[in-house]
């Protein structure tokens, strides 16, 4: 009898162990590639895990780096969703069939710019937020150096600002690529490249991340940082002496985007996250947290009261379809590499 009871106990232990292992193995998973600020990425990761029980593996990298990663992994995709970063590389990814078609149930509630992003990408991407381009300067450092406050794109090419400006590298940064595309659209092809060469002479560092220049400006390590305006305002909200500028000539803007990676291993979970991230409660959570000051794409979501008011900014008619085209993008980056970045400063 004792042997029978002992065998029964062992069988029960094995059964529960097997059940636990099976249950663990079948737990939902999601691999998230995230191209917004790390604190927002972590907030999304933790909130989704808590709400759904899904185990999220998140990697944070700039939009250019993430695009390159997805392209390199295309024969054996490892990611499921790409969240954030400027819309241009998302459009390029869609054109190269690196992302999958999916139309969210929240589509009709989105801003026109976010819907246009989806249409231009054949529903292989969608807009999740909107943010205007600009630059910021450290007002304390400006006063110390006795320099005038810059107000326009052209001001940034003046010799008085030599060695005083930072911008990211457009090969790795969506912010910098948007800047390049904006300048070409404002000034035209020939004058636009002349502008980029003149700006290059005033750059002290090309960073990898688009938000790094304005962070350095906030810390007093750099005078002027070219950035999205919400990133400048974020530094000011932290109590740092940053003044954000909307250039007088007008400026471009981003439609920060999200895409499902083609061949995603967890496609069902990817679509679930996609809808979740576009829902009013989640967009309100993200964009009123103080960690992200862009304008949310869902019209039923709330924005942070300190987010830049796009209606007061002179936004150009940015051509996302043209500048998100893979050949246009490759051509601009190649010309910048060969004709601008190599000029001795």
Where are the regions a protein language model picked out?
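Extracytoplasmic ligand-binding site segments that recognize negatively charged/polar headgroups
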Residues: 35-42, 78-221
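A ligand-binding cleft/hinge motif common to bilobed small-molecule-binding domains
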Residues: 88-92, 218, 223-241
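Short beta-strand->loop
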Residues: 100-109, 125, 154, 240-252, ...
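A bilobed periplasmic-binding-protein/Venus flytrap-type ligand-binding module shared by bacterial periplasmic
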Residues: 136-141, 181, 255-266, 285-288
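Periplasmic-binding protein-like
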Residues: 195-200, 206-207, 238-262, 299
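Mature extracytoplasmic/periplasmic domains
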Residues: 261-320
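Conserved C-terminal helix/tail region of periplasmic/extracytoplasmic solute-binding proteins
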Residues: 318-345
């Amino acid at each position: 009898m004792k042997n029978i009871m002992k065998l029964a106990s062992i069988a029960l232990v094995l059964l529960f162990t097997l059940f636990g292992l099976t249950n663990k193995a079948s737990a939902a998973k999601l691999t998230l590639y995230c191209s917004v600020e790390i604190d927002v990425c972590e907030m999304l990761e933790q909130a989704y895990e808590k709400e759904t029980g899904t185990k999220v593996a998140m990697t944070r990298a700039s939009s250019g780096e993430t695009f390159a990663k997805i392209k390199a992994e295309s024969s054996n995709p490892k990611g499921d969703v790409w969240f954030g970063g400027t819309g241009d590389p998302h459009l390029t990814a869609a054109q190269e069939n690196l992302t999958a078609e999916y139309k969210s149930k929240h589509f009709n509630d989105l801003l026109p710019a976010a819907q246009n992003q989806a249409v231009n990408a054949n529903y292989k991407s969608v807009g999740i937020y909107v943010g205007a381009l600009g630059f910021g300067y450290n007002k304390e450092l400006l006063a110390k150096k006795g320099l005038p406050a810059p107000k326009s794109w052209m001001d940034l090419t003046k010799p008085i600002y030599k060695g005083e400006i930072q911008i990211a590298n457009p090969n790795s940064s969506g912010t910098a690529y948007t800047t390049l595309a904006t300048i070409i659209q404002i000034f035209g092809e020939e004058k636009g490249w002349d502008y980029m060469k003149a700006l290059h002479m005033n750059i002290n560092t090309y960073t990898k991340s688009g938000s790094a220049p304005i962070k350095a400006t906030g810390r007093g390590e750099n005078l002027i940082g070219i950035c999205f305006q919400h990133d400048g305002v974020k530094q000011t909200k932290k109590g740092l002496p940053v003044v954000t500028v909307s250039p007088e000539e007008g400026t471009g803007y981003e439609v920060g985007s999200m895409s499902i990676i083609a061949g995603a291993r967890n496609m069902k979970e990817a679509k679930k996250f996609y809808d979740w991230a576009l829902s009013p409660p989640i967009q309100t959570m993200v964009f009123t947290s103080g960690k992200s000051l862009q304008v949310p794409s869902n019209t039923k979501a709330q924005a942070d009261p300190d987010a830049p008011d796009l209606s007061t900014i002179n936004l150009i008619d940015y051509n996302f379809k043209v500048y998100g085209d893979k050949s246009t993008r490759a051509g601009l980056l190649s010309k910048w590499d060969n004709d601008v970045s190599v000029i001795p400063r």
